[in-house]
Amino acid sequence: MTDLPDSTRWQLWIVAFGFFMQSLDTTIVNTALPSMAQSLGESPLHMHMVIVSYVLTVAVMLPASGWLADKVGVRNIFFTAIVLFTLGSLFCALSGTLNELLLARALQGVGGAMMVPVGRLTVMKIVPREQYMAAMTFVTLPGQVGPLLGPALGGLLVEYASWHWIFLINIPVGIIGAIATLLLMPNYTMQTWRFDLSGFLLLAVGMAVLTLALDGSKGTGLSPLAIAGLVAVGVVALVLYLLHARNNNRALFSLKLFRTRTFSLGLAGSFAGRIGSGMLPFMTPVFLQIGLGFSPFHAGLMMIPMVLGSMGMKRIVVQVVNRFGYRRVLVATTLGLSLVTLLFMTTALLGWYYVLPFVLFLQGMVNSTRFSSMNTLTLKDLPDNLASSGNSLLSMIMQLSMSIGVTIAGLLLGLFGSQHVSVDSGTTQTVFMYTWLSMALIIALPAFIFARVPNDTHQNVAISRRKRSAQ
């Protein structure tokens, strides 16, 4: 990339900065949830909605981001994304109630949904094709650093300042990023097709109301009748989308995608798999603080080995899949993650705290292997004309399943805790023990889906090579 013009390098820095903001925000909040609950006068059992409101909004808005960038221009949409994200951060810091915080997090989610996909699109437009891989490696590196710094930085700010600062630090950074975007980034546009607004609204309504219904009376305080109504609305919306997309060449996501068996299995496995693994980044710091009495900063530091294990495993995951095949790797890592989850709970409750960093490092390795294998399996056999649509659907499903996972984790805590989780409660560790046992079972269930994946090692070799050349 040394031969790129200075203006292009600055534009890549802006995109990298956006990736960092978005990735940092996905992890920095987790460590602060118990302190937020105390400050807002809420039960810690309700605080999972702070994460769900953000991730669910990202899932809902993702399908529209690429079309908006092509229609309005990448600079205008990227600038809007940074502004919305920064305003959402300000409103989060100013929130005096949980409901205000949830609305502000949803605003943040709108910005976050546009930031990363539009950033990728920007790189495609400003960098020559032969340098695309190097450019994407450069801009995504800060996105990998964000999860590494987020938990510890969040714990540090909570312990020595207040939880408000995990949002306030975004404001000066966001202002600088917005100004740099206006001054330095070109506003590329493309000829667009007619956006499938009907399909978008049906999917958005279906995803949102079903997630809210899942949270149920434990989180949102809804009556059984209201929950039943939400379920009915959500199911009807999704059925209407299926009818709408059938034989519709302009549908948001074509049903032709599901004619590819590996895509169907991979998407189903990714959805179910990320529900289980999506619980872990939320539950781990909460358990360390409320269940074991760790300080916010200590709990944040404990998350670093998990991120390091995940980053380190990415270098050899292709060789692992080539050697053993998708089916064996996915079944083994799914069951392995369930066992590591049980190991974490056991060592924590036994008081073997010095072992926890090693267990979390192992958890990161197993999870990373499974994620990479799921992603590649899902997309590897799609025809070229469906690859972009399949990738967008996978990205949406990833966010949706993580929001559902966090929702279920909060539901389990509420179910076993009966609203009595606190540091002084003698039943706290028992509540967490039952929750972690349930999580381990949920994490293991996708193994039944992955067991149906064809196990063709030679095919995996060819696909892995193609994957590496495309990155």
Curated annotation (Swiss-Prot):
Record InterPro entries: EmrB-like (IPR004638), MFS (IPR011701), MFS_dom (IPR020846), MFS_trans_sf (IPR036259), Multi-R_MdtD (IPR023721)
Record topological domains on the Cytoplasmic side: 33-48, 98-101, 159-164, 218-224, 284-285, 363-395, 452-471
Location in the cell:
Cell inner membrane
| Annotated GO CC locations | plasma membrane
The cross-references to Pfam families, in alphabetical order and at most eight, read:
MFS_1 (PF07690)
**TM regions (residue ranges):** 12-32, 49-69, 77-97, 102-124, 138-158, 165-185, 197-217, 225-245, 263-283, 286-306, 342-362, 396-416, 431-451
Alphabetized UniProt keyword annotations? Cell inner membrane, Cell membrane, Membrane, Transmembrane, Transmembrane helix, Transport
Residue ranges annotated as Periplasmic topological domain:
1-11, 70-76, 125-137, 186-196, 246-262, 307-341, 417-430
In its UniProt record, a GO molecular function of this protein is: transmembrane transporter activity
- Signal sequence span per UniProt? none
Q: Indicate the family of this protein.
A: Belongs to the major facilitator superfamily. TCR/Tet family.
This chain's protein is named Putative multidrug resistance protein MdtD
Organism listed in the record? Shigella boydii serotype 4 (strain Sb227)
